From Swiss-Prot:
Zinc finger boundaries on the chain: RING-type: 123-172, 283-311
Family note: Belongs to the RBR family. Ariadne subfamily.
Comment on bound cofactor: Binds 4 Zn(2+) ions per subunit.
Domain of life: Eukaryota
Source organism of this protein record: Arabidopsis thaliana (Mouse-ear cress)
Gene Ontology MF terms in the entry: ubiquitin-protein transferase activity; zinc ion binding
Its EC number(s): 2.3.2.31
Gene Ontology biological process: protein ubiquitination
Name under which the protein is recorded: Probable E3 ubiquitin-protein ligase ARI1
Biased composition (Polar residues): 540-568
Length: 597
């Protein structure tokens, strides 16, 4: 076994059946917390979305003794971070908390928003005298006719201001009561009231830094809440595994920026990409493409970084038309041989890393097809009269193989950018780059060698072996499983501490390694009592909508391009609430079509 275990891993060997009895489970228990511990990520379904939002609203309403729309405004301002909101309240007080979020709460609250029909009142907007029952008063005391209020609400909702509709009185910053908005709008525009409700509900996801939509295609309708750290990889209940930070497929040990660049580089080049490559250069700070539209060689990116167009090096802003203060670079020379040599070297380097990346990706796909075959072998072995009855070591080894293949595959994309001459050219000297590259490649090769050995042993026809041979292959698979897990952990530690940790520009971070694989998000369960639900009014208020069920994300583990999303966008569906359940409406359809359905 010395040919595929390093000396450091010899302590992990199991040389007998008794030693290896629970080798994998014991090793994993040291690396991971107990399964009984509460998951750090939760799945918020359409049914639990309202409960999740109400749980946070209720906590703020009870602590500050305010109405629901005021609590919602505060939570949106603080990105639905209840703990941060409470911390500001304790440190700075209620007045500072409210003023910072733009919330106006009046000491005197008018008890009734409506007036008797017998009274005659004048609206200061349309200047008409109307019966009292045609007028409505907000908490701030400003009173206008229902038609003017409705028009004001309609404009605000259509302009995307549903979450912060303010009073239309001059210089009044009070937030309008959601119940009044819903009641008035639903009488004339039920579809708009449903849209209003949907925006309020989805603000919990779109304005919440701890919650994001699952990027599955077609959309599964779920959202994921990561309570501790957004730098994690998570598995939705629909089966999709993705990076919570960038919403692309799980890609550690690559950073999000590295994976975005690698994904674009591997994609078939279109005319647009060719044009961008020819006419733009990457900013040395944020790495976004910048186009030069004339003028001198000093270029300023939208992030504020100035750089030289000729060499791409970061510079200051002081310059003349012909020179940049404190900066000099080799002028452009038409040296065709050097250009061709560098282009050839870059191409060969990319080809090498892409070939290894693709090889492990393809191997993982082939091994995934063998899963059923291996399970059949396990089933046959369990029916045989063998001393060994438990074959969980096979499935554990298979799971370990898939995880380590994924790590190996993405490690080549990481190495391409980490040890290239573009991304970190100012962070490392050539000598430092070579030393770190050798350190990383040593660990990468050890992991690769052990993974290939594990794959070979799992493909053995152990269902046809004798007792002694089954015991022997069992020890081999358990030892290799423990070894590749240890090597994966060491590779992550090397990347986090020795490679990325030594960089001055800390924009590259990776999700931590998990011995048991990507964490599957648990179902969300509201901790608020059912009696607390009486404090909230139903959000339908007579609105109607088309009931539909979102499609499940069948095949959501397909190509990387189908699940990648550049921003935290809401699915293009709208809805209301019927019987306290979310129903969906398509806002792209005409209102009359929706009403007919």
């Amino acid at each position: 076994m010395d040919d595929y275990f390093s000396a450091e891993e010899e302590a992990c060997y199991y040389s007998s059946d008794q030693d290896s009895l629970d080798g994998i489970d014991n090793e994993e228990s040291e690396l991971q917390p107990l399964s009984s511990k509460r998951s750090n990520t939760q799945v918020i379904t359409q049914e639990s979305l309202l409960a999740a939002q109400r749980e946070d609203l209720l906590r703020v309403m009870e602590l500050l003794s305010i109405k629901e729309h005021h609590a919602r405004t505060l939570l949106i301002h603080y990105q639905w971070d209840v703990e941060k909101l409470f911390a500001v309240f304790v440190e700075k007080g209620k007045d500072s908390l409210f003023s910072g979020a733009g919330v106006t709460v009046f000491d005197y609250q008018y008890g009734n928003s409506s007036f008797p029909q017998s009274s005659q009142m004048s609206c200061d907007v349309c200047m008409e005298d109307l019966p009292g029952d045609h007028m409505t008063r907000m908490d701030c005391g400003h009173c206008f006719c229902n038609n003017c209020w409705t028009e004001h609400f309609t404009v605000q909702i259509n302009e995307g201001q549903s979450k912060r509709i303010r009073c239309m009185a001059h210089q009044c910053n009070a937030i309008c009561d959601e119940d009044i908005v819903r009641s008035l709008v639903s009488k004339k525009r039920p579809d708009l009231a449903a849209k209003f409700d949907r925006y309020l509900l989805e603000s919990y996801i779109e304005d919440n830094r701890m919650v994001k939509w699952c990027p599955s295609t077609p959309h599964c309708g779920n959202a994921i809440r990561a309570e501790d750290d957004k730098l994690c990889e998570v598995e939705c209940s629909c089966g999709l595994q993705f990076c919570f930070s960038c919403l692309c497929q799980a890609h550690s040990p690559c950073s999000c920026l590295m994976w975005e660049l690698w994904r674009k580089k591997c994609r078939d080049e279109s005319e647009t990409i060719n044009w961008i490559t020819v006419h733009t250069k990457l900013c040395p700070k944020c790495y976004k493409p910048v186009e030069k539209n004339g003028g001198c060689n000093l270029v300023r990116c939208i992030c504020g970084q100035c750089f030289c167009w000729l060499c791409g090096g970061a510079t200051g802003s002081d310059h003349t038309y012909r020179s940049i203060a404190g900066h000099s670079c080799g002028r452009y020379q038409d040296d065709k041989e050097k250009q061709m040599e560098r282009a050839k070297r870059d191409l060969n380097r990319y080809t090498h890393y892409h070939h290894r990346y693709k090889a492990h990706t393809d191997s993982s796909k082939l091994e995934d097809k063998l899963r059923d075959t291996i399970h059949e072998k396990v089933s046959k072995s369990e029916k045989r009269e063998l001393k060994l009855k438990d074959f969980s070591w096979v499935t554990n080894g298979l799971d370990r193989l898939f995880r380590s293949r994924r790590v190996l595959s993405y490690s080549y994309a990481f190495a391409y950018y980490m040890f290239g001459e573009e991304m970190f050219k100012d962070e490392m000297t050539p000598e430092e780059r070579e030393i770190k590259k050798n350190l990383f490649e040593d660990q990468q090769q050890q992991l690769e060698s052990n993974v290939e050995k594990l794959s070979q042993f799992l493909e053995e026809p152990f269902d046809e072996f004798s007792n002694d041979k089954v015991m022997a292959i069992r020890i081999q698979i358990i030892n290799l499983s423990v070894a590749v897990d240890t090597l994966c952990k060491k590779m992550y530690e090397c990347i986090e501490n020795d490679l990325l940790g030594s960089l001055q520009l800390g924009i590259h971070n990776i999700s931590p390694y998990r011995s048991k694989g990507i964490e599957q998000a648990a179902q969300f369960y509201a901790s608020w009592n059912s009696k607390d639900a009486d404090k909230f009014q139903p959000l339908d208020s007579g609105t109607s909508g088309v009931t539909s069920r979102p499609e499940q994300a069948s095949g959501s583990r397909s190509s990387e391009d189908t699940i990648c999303s550049s921003s935290q966008k809401r699915p293009k569906k709208e809805g209301s609430f019927l019987n306290n359940k979310v129903t969906l409406l398509d806002l792209n359809l005409p209102a009359d079509f929706v009403d007919q359905n």
